[in-house]
Amino acid sequence: MPAHIRLAVPADAPLLPRIERSAAQAFRSIDGLGWLADAATLSVERHRQLIALSTCWVAVDAQGQPQGFLSAERHGSDLHIEELSVCQSMQGQGWGRKLVETAMDHARSNHLRCVTLTTFTHVPWNAPF
């Protein structure tokens, strides 16, 4: 099966912190943000909570293994992206954008007002968002 995006399932939860750590290594190349590479990740329990809400999606490779994820939570009529991470080996291939588009499609189909994300705008890969 080709790489694709699907809703996360409980068995994915223990795999997601590794992806977040891998993705965060890219911050080492940004002055003043290297500390993010060593920052705490979302806990497995928090991932399980978001998976239970059906607001967590994973980008899986051709072998079906998660390589990226987007975790979000509904706040009133908004969907807030809590974490978006793509492992280094899949970065630069559009998977982050596809995950965001998936969350936006979810928000539209559930008649939510907007999708929010808190990010660093001066980081090149964050700028489009």
Predicted feature descriptions by range:
Residues V58, Q65-E73, H80-S85:
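Conserved beta-strand in the GNAT
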Residues L84-Q91, T119-T121:
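A short, internal acetyl-CoA/4′-phosphopantetheine-binding micro-motif in the GNAT/acyltransferase core
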Residues M90, G94-T102:
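Conserved acetyl-CoA pyrophosphate-binding loop and the N-cap/start of the following alpha-helix
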Residues V44-V58, H80:
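A short helix-loop-beta-strand connector motif used in the catalytic cores of GNAT acetyltransferases and
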Residues R97, S109, T121-F129:
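Conserved active-site alpha-helix within GNAT-family acetyltransferase domains
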Residues H4-R18:
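A short beta-loop-alpha structural element at the N-terminal edge
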Residues A107-T119:
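Conserved GNAT acetyl-CoA-binding A-motif
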Residues R18-R46:
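Conserved GNAT-fold acetyl-CoA-binding loop/helix
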